[in-house]
Amino acid sequence: FIIGFFMVKELSAEEKFELIKRNTVEILGEDELKEMLKKGEKLKHYIGFEISGKPHLGHGLVCMAKVKDLMDAGVDCSIFLADWHSWINDKLGGNLEIIKKIAAGYFKRENSRFNWF
């Protein structure tokens, strides 16, 4: 097999800001965000999905593309699968076991971890 090596360029604060801003409508506190990036502060982001069935292209293309931008900008990202919200909103018949089974199929990578609340 072939192993490839490549250099990863450290992004400037401005480059990180542009990644974060890409394909967004609005950023509240742009100046504060720029200052945090200049200072090298660690940023965190989370996004949550109510489980209502199998994921669709909007999840994969739009939401995950933005998560990738954030991760590329050095932001620590968490993705929450809102099983409890799905249950109380009677998604998938309100069956928590089915909800968890469907949710577990959203991400099949070995490094995915599921915390059920």
Where are these regions (language model features)?
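A glycine-rich phosphate/pyrophosphate-binding beta-strand-loop-alpha-helix module
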Residues: 80-100
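Non-catalytic terminal extensions that flank enzyme cores
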Residues: 2-52
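A glycine-rich helix N-cap at a beta->alpha junction
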Residues: 99-117
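Short active-site-proximal "capping" loops at secondary-structure junctions
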Residues: 50-54, 84-87
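Short, flexible active-site-proximal loops enriched in glycine and acidic residues
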Residues: 73-83, 114-117
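Structured alpha-helical segments in the cores of large, soluble enzyme domains
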Residues: 33, 68-75, 102-107
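Histidine-anchored nucleotide/phosphate-binding helix
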Residues: 57-79
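Short secondary-structure transition/capping motifs
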Residues: 52-55, 59, 95-102
